């Protein structure tokens, strides 16, 4: 089965996610998180991509990205995951023992309106949702912590947002998403479908060839001929 197409056009917004192979831990200690953030900084120097929000968890990571050239997101994350894999194996002496990541990263386009804020909140409250902290801003390995630290700790990773940040942003992040918002984000993660209003989603799906992501996966159900008139 062919891999689904990936949208990666300059100046568009995207959510990206990857996990450890079989959901295994890829950040075992604080030094691992620090090392990955240094890799991110190196990648930003090499490839035209901006980090708007992110969160690193023990076995996966989330990013909200804005490439500044076509293909910038894919090139950036491909280099980051490859470099992280190489350095992880070198550090832990695990070369030849299997993959670090489950595969290539997953992504979906985000509409640059209130839908962007929903995804940013989803990302920045990931550790809070997992009950690892009492407040979202307490999680050291993410953009909210960095945004609240002035100046931003080295290495510098964050770019200015293309939309003005909503007032009382920290409190907004600490408030749970509505069930509708949460399920909509999770569906876009699962399918790789654009996240926005219906008209925008249909337009972007046609533009990037993502129509298949809007359809339920799996084989269509076969109706029982005995019940065809019921």
Predicted regions span which residues?
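Short Pro-Cys-Gly-centered "Cys-loop" motif that presents a nucleophilic cysteine in a tight turn
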Residues: 1-57, 66-230
């Amino acid at each position: 089965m062919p891999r689904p197409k990936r949208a990666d056009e300059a100046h568009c917004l995207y959510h990206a996610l990857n996990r450890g192979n079989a959901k295994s831990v890829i950040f075992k200690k604080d030094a691992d998180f620090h090392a990955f953030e240094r890799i991110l900084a190196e990648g930003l120097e090499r490839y035209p991509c901006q980090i708007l929000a992110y969160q690193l968890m023990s076995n996966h990571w989330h990013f909200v990205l804005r490439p500044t050239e076509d293909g910038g997101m894919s090139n950036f994350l491909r280099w980051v995951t490859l470099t992280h894999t190489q350095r992880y194996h070198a550090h832990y002496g695990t070369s030849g023992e299997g993959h670090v990541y489950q595969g290539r990263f997953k992504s979906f386009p985000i509409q640059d309106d209130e839908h962007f804020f929903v995804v940013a909140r989803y990302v920045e409250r990931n550790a809070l949702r997992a009950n690892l902290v009492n407040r979202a801003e307490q999680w050291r390995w993410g953009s909210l912590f960095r945004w609240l630290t002035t100046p931003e700790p080295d290495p510098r990773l964050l770019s200015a947002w293309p939309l003005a940040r909503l007032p009382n942003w920290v409190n907004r992040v600490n408030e749970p998403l509505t069930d509708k918002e949460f399920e909509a984000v999770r569906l876009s993660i699962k399918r790789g479908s654009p996240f926005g209003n219906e008209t925008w989603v249909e337009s972007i799906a046609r533009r990037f060839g993502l129509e298949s992501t809007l359809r339920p996966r799996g084989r269509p159900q076969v109706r029982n001929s005995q019940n065809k008139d019921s």
